[in-house]
Amino acid sequence: MSTAEAEGRVYNVGGQERENMDVVRRILDLTGASPDLVRHVEDRPGHDRRYSVDSSKLSGLGWQPKHSFDSGGLEETVDWYREHRDWWEPIKSGDYKRYYDEQYAARLA
């Protein structure tokens, strides 16, 4: 990628668009977790409906993703989280947990 061409510009970095439930099902499969853990809740006001990133401008400079959804990228991510529990376990308590309890408790009832 030519950095001279890219200087001062904004680029989106992404891969192929996937439905949220496709990602959820794959994570459940990779972790061996039960699909019964999935709970559908009412959307909160302003909740994002989708995440779609167009990286064609960046691809025009020669950038290509190193991983894809189907070629091991998600597996590597799940493995990283398994190996770095000390990084994410603290978010299950304290202010972060209180925030999610406030946002979702009524919708999960």
Predicted regions and their residues:
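C-terminal substrate-binding subdomain of Rossmann-fold SDR/epimerase-dehydratase oxidoreductases
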Residues: 1-109
